[in-house]
From Swiss-Prot:
This is Translation initiation factor IF-2. Keywords: Cytoplasm, GTP-binding, Initiation factor, Nucleotide-binding, Protein biosynthesis. GTP binds at residues 684-691, 734-738, 788-791. The gene is infB. It comes from Prochlorococcus marinus (strain NATL2A). GO terms for molecular function: GTP binding; GTPase activity; translation initiation factor activity.
Amino acid sequence: MTSSGKIRIYELSKDLSLDNKDVLDAARKLAIAAKSHSSSISSLEANQIKDFLKKSNTINTTIKSSKNLDKQILSVKKNPVKTQKDQKTEPKKKNHDQTELSQAKLNTLLKPSQTLIKSQGSSQANNQKALKNKFPAKQQITSPSKPNKPLPPNPRVEVKPIISKPLTQAERAIPQSEQKKDGQFINQPKRSELAKKSIGQPKQINPQEPKRPLAPPSRPKIDIQDKKPLQPNNQKAKTRINQGEISPQKVGQGNIQKIKSQNKQNAPSRTPQPPTKGNTLELVGAPIRKEKPVNKPHTNEVRNKPVMPSRPGAPKPPTAANRQGLSNRPGSNNRIGGTGRPGSPNRQGPNRGGVANRTTQGQNRPGANNRAGAPVRSGSPNRGGMQNRPGVPTRSLGGPNRSNNRPGVPSGMRKPVAPSELMQLQKPQARPNAPQRKTDSPTSLRPKRENSTGARPPVNRPTPAAPKKPAHRPGGTAAAPRRTGRPDWDDSAKLDALRNKSPQKQRQKVHIIGENDDALTAERGGFAGEQQAVVLSASLARPSKPKVGKRNNGKPLTALKKRKKETTRQRQRRRAMELRASREAKLVRPEMIVVPEDNLTVQELADMLSVESSEIIKSLFFKGITATVTQSLDLATIETVAEEFGVPVLQDDVEEAAKKTVEMIEEGDLKYLIRRPPVVTVMGHVDHGKTSLLDAIRKARVAAGEAGGITQHIGAYQIETEHDGSTKKLTFLDTPGHEAFTAMRARGTRVTDVAILVVAADDGVRPQTLEAISHARAAKVPIVVAINKIDKEGSSPDRVKQELSEQDLLSEEWGGDVVMVPVSAIKGENIDKLLEMVLLVTEVEDLQANPDRLAKGTVIEAHLDKAKGPVATLLVQNGTLKSGDVVAAGPVLGKVRAMVDENGSRIKEAGPSCPVEALGFSEVPTAGDEFEVYPDEKAARAVVGERATDARAARLAQQMASRRVSLSSMSGQASEGELKELNIILKADVQGSLEAILGSLEQLPKDEVQVRVLLSAPGEITETDIDLAAASGAVIVGFNTSMASGAKRAADANGVDVREYEVIYKLLEDIQLAMEGLLEPEMIEEALGVAEVRAIFSIGKSAVAGCYVTNGKIQRNCRARVKRGKQIVFEGDLDSLKRNKDDVKDVSTGFECGIGCDRFANWEEGDQIEAFKLVTQRRKLNN
């Protein structure tokens, strides 16, 4: 019991001596919430469960079943009859209660504890088990739905049977056949369980011993008044039994008395035994071999054969009517007392368990030759075959479940032929409709197959060898007749033999007759007809391959000769043609490739560029890079290779950044939507006139005040224009065109409604133009093309249209759907037409928003102002932003203190599609994040807290990435101390500039110098930054920012290098120069002159060369290289230089001199002396 006074399920089950699942089952029925054995319930609920279990007598049943466990071995509990006292006191059970009892009993039958086999037992216990085994079919009628249900208690009927010998082990192994196989129950015949007694040890059971009816009161009964067993024509009764309407218990009572009468006689007889009662069923089976192991249940499951009822009108002995054993194999005979297995000796005495008498097989198998005098052993156990038991579903191994009492096959279908007849001589007859054959003898039975259970597994049934050379196969097409007039050595005869090899193999197989054979023989003309015998498994009854018609004996075999095997030369020629075709298909180069995750293998890059991988490897080899087809390339290398093939490269994550991810309009806004101004983004290549076009639209001069004449920020403006007699508002976003500001362009595309693509008429389509097109397509926004600079000389708008058409942007004038307007930003031509086209396109888009809700939108740009603090440029996309609103922008929380429009005027609220600068954020938000206004600060803080954790993890990952040094870049340099690092601290004015600079730094080569960004943040340079730079030896780089008070003095005192830039070009160039300054200078050769040896003077052991200077001049103590022809014979220092026996420093062109080297004296006339010196040179980064 818990501290709160509740009781756990396992405690309650322990008190009640029950399993946890029983208590959980009761709780579920009482609608008490209990999920597992450790769940807690109240005392009231525990008392309800106890009362429920006491009413259902589950506790008593469990205790009693544990005590009588030895008496329940391999038995199926029947539903005992209640006494008169119980019938008076207990209410009548409903049908569904009986179903639950049946299911519980079936579960009891399958428990492992009841499958144990005991070697000894008392006769009284065995007799009681025999009574319980009379009714196994009752539990099998109802499919089990709740197998774990406990057994409800029922009073047992004490029966005093006649004492006889104890049961054998084979009897106690019967219920093992009813185990689970492949998720289904293989139900054994009811009579086979009673017939498992030994012939020499019969049991006498008095069927009239119980005084009360054995079936439950609510179960309907049926009286079988026919003297015969159940026949196929009695379909109504069989159907009722199969459907569970009729209890088969009375049928089982007759079996007991029949066994008693048969065991008394215990003699073989061919005549049927007279029944003692009208409702009895007769049992005929094979005797049991005692030496057969009894603990293998698969012997019962594998040796089952379906019952084949007799054909209407055919005589049928009542004792062996429903007996069906194993099928007769080809060449096997039915012998008296033998098993009839081909290839095995016939034994006298009882048959093996599970193997039926072959006499009954011959009677039930069509076309079998039954020998006269083969006795029917009455009273022998029927372990092998499935009996005609009503209501018990059977399952064939490998086949579907079917009813035992299957209706007979229509008369138009051909009857199956026994395998023994397949191998016999038959007269060739033309039987296209496959008529039925007459019975071979008046005593042979040809019953229709009623409860066929499919094919038997061939594991325990070895296939006998069929005759390899049958005497004659009339009408068969398996073996073609030998061609006449051809010698034995003829090749065609050998080809015939090879061709007929496969049918001969088929002929050696044994046909397994299944339940689908009737339909198949009707379709194929019979097994023993004109066509070849078909070997078919009943569980794999599928449409066979179409048969080849009869071949004309007179025609030569030419079809096989035409099939020539492909030679090696033909295969090589075919492969060369396929390779040539694939290369021709790859000649078309793509306009642009998208690189996912900043790396590609050589093979992937070759596929994208539509070139061979060897071309990529050759290109890299010329750059000093050894690569294989599986080696990964970084983005810089990919761009270098792609430039050689004239294909620009675009990063995949940049295109993903342009996609719209958040839907600003919610379901609750649909009723209050109104039209909103469109958001237009101006995009294009650098210096194509985007800002000048906006200046012409706004009638301002923004471009004149930009540093370097290029845009480095994203600007947002709102203008008003006249359209259709009314004033329309347009919101414009100006994006940078430089390649470093890719993220800015993607951010602008994500919030836009229409994209204006500016293309210079004199420059055409450029890389950033292609990137802008990809951004617009990723955001799924319409494109309006503005062909600018039409007033310049050499401009060609038609050429621009042609280049754009290659990018699937076809002008309306050429039959496309893209609006293209030629404009001049300087002269203001066609500006009004451009605005009109933009408004027309946006009207089609039907842009709407709900102004009467809390604002939602996107952070376009953000920066840190030294006077105002964090400032964010916000674009309201839905709702209205007001002063005082609590805003959460990503992980940053803020409260709007003031809002300023693009002109610097203060405003109190901003509606949809309105760009504003908002003040009041706790820190600088990240550009590109979505912002949302919350009703109170508490709700906003809850959202911001979760986002801050994610942002902190992302920031840490970025810092680790900045310190990452790849193994390939380190190689052997780290061990030699040659790996250099450049530490920088980056401060910029806005967040977008930081993104652009960091992205550009990533593109710099890092093979020998690693750029390590210690800190990157928007805002001015402070004293804290100076201290960090002094401690780490870093360089401070400022972009469009200023230094705080005291920072300049601190930098001078600490000797920190602070660089300030306004244009990104200069910043990146200086950082690259600083990286190159860290590299060790390299030594290069500088040529001085060339001299020719014309005479040789020996001086002691050494020699001096008399030379003539032909080019340049020769200096003393310089480096010299002696070449003899094309071979270098010496390279070293020039130690002595004389002219007219005087030492000189140098000798110019046209003069003679004497040259001597201390380490070389092997001069020859005609040698060339090249003089050079080594000088140091500043190294550059390897691109």
